[in-house]
Structure formats: structure tokens, C-alpha cells
A protein has these predicted regions:
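Interfacial helix-loop-helix linkers and transmembrane-helix boundary segments
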Residues: 66-67, 71-73, 129-132, 188-194, ...
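12-transmembrane solute porter fold
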Residues: 6-21, 26-28, 41, 116, ...
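Conserved aromatic/hydrophobic "specificity hotspots" at molecular recognition or selectivity sites
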Residues: 160-200, 248, 258
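Transmembrane-helix bundle of Major Facilitator Superfamily
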Residues: 1-180, 316, 323, 341-344
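Alpha-helical transmembrane segments
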Residues: 80, 201-206
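Intrinsic disorder in cytosolic terminal tails and internal cytosolic loops
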Residues: 1-4, 188, 450-485
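Membrane-interface helix caps and helix-loop-helix hairpins in membrane proteins
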Residues: 95, 159, 186-191, 216-222, ...
């Protein structure tokens, strides 16, 4: 690869694509999973959240493991882990075992995700990194686009279980090619032990908070089953912050947040991706349960979002590089909020041209305006030496926002129990859910410290040689929707 061979690049791209496709297809399969297991909405939430929880909690820690012990080694270990967990998911006899297997699958995703781009950065000559990063970004976008098609077809034609089983042959190809073509690399300048305590504190803390937020609607927010996990989780997260302040090799360098621009960019990221996750979690279920869409129809309903982002995201990132990200980071969330408000108009008829398409088109336009400048603003706020860590932190903030949103928004709008199985009730509750999400995105548009460019320099470039927006635009995009096509 150092001589320009591209086989290793394709291996890492395929690894990233495997996790991306898996994330997009699960949302399409939720109604089928619920029917097979007679599962309530809380259990379906945990099918999604258990994966996101371990992925978000361990992502930064797994990145440090690759830097210390070898990126190829950790990447391939993550692929094996992910594949074995996928096998258990595919044969899960109950919702409880599926949820547990999804949590284990998230650990594998955390192990392989950081290495997928880091291997390219470390293995290619500087002159080749831009091209390699572009291939990585482009195929990630393709994976995001085909995931809903593949998931909808598998669920409709065969079984939801195949969305997990399909990972096994893909993983076998990755391992066989990776052993041969991916070179080993590590950061020889690192010393000391990895931040194991930090990884445990943040993961268990997020678990406690998430569990309490999901348990609240069923048993009451002030009752011990909901209140105690939230309190314990919050205390553990506070301990995590205190630990990171004094750790010799912290998993999360808190010094990054000394920059007001970096902090503001991540606040806006949290708001935008919280609203995004709520939309992408609910809409496939709503279209199938309320509007009568088949799984494949629901799977391709968000295709306009992907298309708009593919066409406009690079242009939005280039504009932010010229004029600074303040305008787009302020206007974009307002457009997202408008699109989310239109989701509330989608009813039992589910007419694609008059109800679904306007909502997803405006929603996608807002994402295209916002996402790339946000990433650029976060990277511009730090030195080039910390660009990789800043990118990882921003990505982790997006995933944590998705976790919290899926836990909170359904309960806040009354979507509990088996409401999703009753179209009339689900339609009314989902309208409240859609109406609540613009409140997540709108504060981002009015954030008083909207990210602004650093006068002395343009937004920093990622170490891979490509601009930041090229490999971020579609990372956390998970889910799908449509009218009768």
C-alpha cells in the first residue's frame, strides 16, 4: 500500500461499509422483529440503543487501542467480533437475547470503525491519501444508500434474520484479504497504559442514564427503577470527567473543549443528530405500521435525503471553507427543523408526493447545509496535531445524541408499550413525536456562539489529506422511509 497498492484500502472500506449497512437495515426490520417476538416499543428501542450504547461508549477507547497495539490487529479483531455477534443476532430466539447480541455487536463496531480510516492515513503516501480517502468516503455513501434497499428486500422476501447473517460472508472476505493486504501500523510515540477506567466509566454511565430514561414512562420518572439508574449514571459520567482531567493518557482530552468554537460545534452537532436519530428511528416503523408500506417501500423512502447529501454536501463544505461555517451552522438547523415539522403531516394515507417527499427533501437539504460545515468548524478550532482526535470526538457526540434521542423522544410523545401495533394510536402519538423534534434542531440555529472560522487559518484538513466534510457527511445516517412507490 505504501507503494500505491489499493487492495488494503478496499478492505478497510468494506469493513466500514459492513457496519454502515447493518445500521441502516435494522431500522427497516423493527416492525418484523416486533411481530416475531411480540415485542413492545421499549424492546425495539433497546434493539437499536444497545448497539449504539457500546459503540458510542467504546469508540474513543478502541481508537487508542489501535494506536497502541496495531491498527490492523484491532481492525481485524473487530471484524471477527462483529461477525460472531451478527451470527448470534440472526439466530436469537428472543428479544432479550437479540438486545444482548446487539450490544456485543456494538463492541465489534467500535473496534473496527476507528481503524477503517486510520489504516489509510498510516499506509498511503501523502500524495495518495486524498484519493484513498475519497474512495473511502464515496463507498461509505454508496453503502448508506444501498442499505435500505437491501434491508427492505431481505425483510420482505425472506426474513429479518438475514440482515445479520449477510455480515458473515462479508466478514470472511475482509479477514482473508486483510491478513494479506493490510499492513500493520501503530503510534510508536505513545507510552503508558490505555485508559481502561475511562472506557468503563463512560460506558456504564451512559447505560445507567439511558436505562432510566427508557424506564421512566412505564413506571414513573420519580420511582426508583427510573430515578436511581439516572442518578448513578450521571455520577459515573461526572467521575469520568474527573478521571479524564488527571489521567496520564486520557481517552478524551478535555483540553479540546477549552476552545469555544469546538464546544459550540459539538453542541450544535448534538442537537442536529438528536433530531436526525429520532426521525430515522421512527419513520420506517410509522410508514409500515400506519401508512401500509411494504418493508422495501419504507426502505427506499429516504433515498432523496441520501441523493441531496451526495450532490450538495461537498459544495456546502467548500463554501464553508471560503466564507466560514457560521452562516450554514445557523441556517441549516432551521431548515432541518422545518423538514421535521413537515413529518407531522404524514398520515394514514402516506401519500409520497404530497406528504413524504416534501418533508424528506427539506430535511435532506438542511442536513446537506449543516453537516459538512459543522465538521469543518470542529476541526478548525484545534491544531492539526489534534485533528484526528477532534474528528473522533465530534463523531462520538453524534452517536451519543442518537442514543439519547431514541431513549427520550418516543416517551416524551407518548409512544410506549405496544402503541406501534395500533395504527390510529400510533399515528396520533407519532405526530406528537414529529412535532417535538424541531425543538431539538431549532436551538442549534439560534446558538449564541455559532461556530465561526478562525481568522488565521481555514478549517483544518483531516490527516488523510481530504477535507473533513468528505468523510463525515453520511457517517451517522441510519434509517429509512417513502410513499407508495
Amino acid at each position: 500500500m505504501r507503494a500505491g497498492r489499493g487492495a488494503g484500502c478496499w478492505v478497510t472500506v468494506l469493513g466500514w461499509a459492513m457496519t454502515t449497512i447493518d445500521a441502516t437495515v435494522v431500522g427497516i426490520a423493527l416492525p418484523a422483529i416486533g411481530r416475531d417476538f411480540c415485542a413492545g416499543l421499549t424492546e425495539l428501542q433497546w434493539v437499536v440503543m444497545s448497539y449504539t450504547l457500546t459503540l458510542a461508549g467504546l469508540l474513543l477507547f478502541a481508537g487508542t487501542l489501535g494506536d497502541r497495539y496495531g491498527r490492523k490487529r484491532i481492525f481485524l479483531a473487530g471484524v471477527v467480533w462483529f461477525a460472531m455477534a451478527s451470527l448470534v443476532c440472526g439466530f436469537a430466539p428472543s428479544a432479550a437475547l437479540l438486545i444482548g447480541a446487539r450490544a456485543v455487536q456494538g463492541v465489534g463496531g467500535a473496534l473496527l470503525t476507528p481503524g477503517s480510516l486510520a489504516i489509510i492515513e498510516a499506509s498511503f503516501r501523502p500524495a495518495d491519501r486524498g484519493k484513498a480517502s475519497g474512495a473511502w468516503s464515496g463507498l461509505s455513501a454508496v453503502a448508506t444508500a444501498i442499505g435500505p434497499f437491501l434491508g427492505g428486500w431481505l425483510v420482505q422476501a425472506v426474513s429479518w434474520r438475514l440482515i445479520f447473517a449477510i455480515n458473515l460472508p462479508v466478514a470472511a472476505v475482509i479477514i482473508a484479504a486483510g491478513v494479506r493486504h493490510v499492513p500493520e501500523s501503530r503510534d510508536t510515540g505513545l507510552s503508558g497504559r490505555p485508559d481502561i477506567a475511562g472506557g468503563i466509566l463512560v460506558t456504564v454511565g451512559l447505560t445507567g442514564v439511558t436505562y432510566g430514561l427508557v424506564a421512566g414512562p412505564g413506571g414513573g420518572w420519580t420511582r426508583p427503577p427510573a430515578l436511581m439508574p439516572v442518578i448513578a449514571g450521571a455520577l459515573l459520567l461526572a467521575c469520568f470527567v474527573a478521571w479524564e482531567r488527571r489521567a496520564r493518557a486520557p481517552m478524551l482530552p478535555l483540553s479540546l473543549f477549552a476552545s469555544g468554537q469546538f464546544s459550540a460545534a459539538n453542541v450544535v452537532t448534538f442537537a442536529v443528530y438528536g433530531a436526525l436519530a429520532g426521525a430515522l428511528w421512527l419513520l420506517p416503523v410509522e410508514l409500515q405500521q400506519v401508512s401500509g408500506y411494504a418493508a422495501l417501500q419504507a426502505g427506499i423512502s429516504l433515498l432523496p435525503v441520501t441523493a441531496i447529501m451526495l450532490v450538495l454536501s461537498a459544495r456546502s463544505g467548500a463554501l464553508a471553507a471560503r466564507i466560514g461555517p457560521r452562516l450554514q451552522a445557523s441556517a441549516g438547523p432551521a431548515v432541518i427543523a422545518a423538514g421535521l415539522a413537515l413529518f407531522a403531516r404524514i398520515g394514514p394515507s402516506g401519500n409520497y408526493l404530497t406528504e413524504v417527499l416534501p418533508a424528506v427533501a427539506i430535511f435532506g437539504l438542511g442536513l446537506a447545509i449543516t453537516v459538512a460545515p459543522l465538521k469543518a468548524a470542529a476541526l478548525a478550532a484545534v491544531s492539526a496535531r489534534h485533528a484526528g482526535m477532534a474528528s473522533a470526538v465530534n463523531n462520538d457526540v453524534a452517536r451519543t445524541a442518537a442514543l439519547i434521542a431514541v431513549a427520550v423522544l418516543p416517551a416524551a410523545s407518548g409512544l410506549t408499550g405496544t402503541a406501534y401495533l395500533h395504527p390510529a394510536r400510533f399515528s396520533a402519538d407519532s405526530a406528537r413525536h414529529h412535532s417535538s423534534r424541531p425543538a431539538c434542531a431549532w436551538p442549534a440555529a439560534r446558538w449564541p456562539h455559532s461556530p465561526s472560522p478562525t481568522p488565521a487559518r481555514r478549517p483544518a484538513r483531516h490527516r488523510s489529506g481530504g477535507t473533513a466534510h468528505r468523510h463525515f457527511t453520511l457517517e451517522p445516517l441510519v434509517g429509512s422511509r417513502t410513499d407508495r412507490l
